């Protein structure tokens, strides 16, 4: 049993299982409840509602994006299951809130890491900007991010960077957690860009992502929530961090979106924008520390 927490992730697993093993997996979710296949992929919510029906059915349970295991929905599925093997998968085994300490309670102490040769080494391009990110401990973080996202000059900067790197042959991923900002930047970039946010249906998301994978679109604007986990678009080779990131596990996952090996792919690049202001400067130096720890080359533009 493979446990996933979104429909696109479930669909992605189903595609890969069919590609690798040559048979269609069973699906639990979206009105289906199929237990006959050797591999079954299920949605958390449906599995949670049917815990009694599934708990003695499987010998192995794989939990994708296992950093969600501390949520009651996931933990109940695992706690009640009679399976012999439990395997957790995640791009990052740390959580900012420290709850990663429960991982070993569920999955034991053995940790397998994929060999580094599955990944390419990115170069970091540090872009100095004159745009200011608001300081002030009393101003909520969300308000500060919104103010930055509504800054016309900042929107043009992001759109211009995306277009410039796309012109160099990159397939560019721009991530932010402000939907209106992403849509505005996508319009500025022009018809070679697509925008994937929470209000796009799962079917349409796949169509838009396919335009990046197989079509002539070369800039993908997407929300952090969608692209920090689960969606793999191996052709992406450039990441633009359009919202300040001060969370190492999140940064690890976002960078992971563009450094996967693929034949004919150009060397990946991460665009890190350094804004004015004390908060921005402190966060930027934390990110630079992270890049140094990974041993990645950095260039100031």
Residue ranges and their predicted role:
Residues 136-187:
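Conserved interdomain hinge at the start of the Helicase C-terminal
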Residues 1-19, 95, 177-182:
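Conserved Walker A/P-loop ATP-binding site and its immediately adjacent core
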Residues 59-60, 65-125, 291:
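Post-DEXD/H (motif II) to motif III coupling segment of the RecA-like Helicase ATP-binding lobe
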Residues 11, 22-36, 49, 173, ...:
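Conserved helicase ATPase core of P-loop NTP-dependent helicases/translocases
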Residues 29-60, 71-76, 226:
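Conserved helix/coil segment N-terminal to the catalytic DExD/H
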Residues 136-143, 262-301:
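C-terminal helicase lobe
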Residues 56-59, 221-222, 229-244, 252-253, ...:
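A short beta-strand element within the Helicase C-terminal
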Residues 90-93, 238, 246-270, 288:
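Conserved SF2 helicase motif VI
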């Amino acid at each position: 049993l493979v446990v996933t927490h979104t429909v696109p992730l479930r669909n992605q697993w189903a595609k890969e299982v069919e590609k690798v093993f040559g048979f269609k997996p069973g699906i639990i979710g979206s009105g289906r409840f199929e237990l006959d296949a050797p591999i079954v992929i299920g949605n958390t919510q449906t599995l949670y509602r049917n815990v009694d029906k599934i708990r003695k059915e499987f010998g192995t349970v794989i939990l994708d994006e296992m950093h969600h295991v501390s949520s009651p929905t996931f933990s109940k599925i695992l706690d009640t299951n009679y399976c012999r093997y439990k395997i957790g998968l995640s791009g990052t085994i740390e959580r900012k809130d420290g709850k990663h300490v429960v991982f070993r309670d569920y999955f034991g102490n053995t940790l397998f890491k994929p060999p580094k040769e599955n990944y390419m080494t990115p170069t970091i391009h540090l872009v100095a900007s004159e745009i200011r990110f608001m300081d002030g401990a009393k101003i909520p973080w969300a308000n500060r991010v919104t103010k930055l996202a509504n800054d016309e000059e900042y929107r043009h900067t992001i759109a211009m960077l995306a277009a410039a790197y796309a012109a160099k042959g990159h397939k560019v991923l721009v991530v932010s957690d402000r939907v209106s900002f992403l849509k505005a930047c996508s319009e500025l970039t022009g018809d070679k860009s697509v925008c994937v946010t929470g209000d796009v249906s799962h079917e349409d998301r796949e169509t838009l992502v396919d335009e990046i994978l197989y079509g002539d679109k070369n800039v993908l604007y997407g929300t952090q929530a969608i692209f920090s986990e689960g969606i793999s678009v191996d052709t992406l080779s450039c990441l633009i961090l359009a919202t300040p990131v001060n969370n190492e596990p999140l940064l690890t996952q976002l960078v992971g979106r563009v450094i996967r090996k693929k034949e004919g792919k150009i060397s990946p690049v991460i665009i890190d924008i350094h804004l004015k202001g004390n908060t921005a400067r402190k966060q930027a130096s934390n990110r630079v520390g992270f890049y140094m720890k990974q041993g990645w080359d950095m260039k100031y533009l």
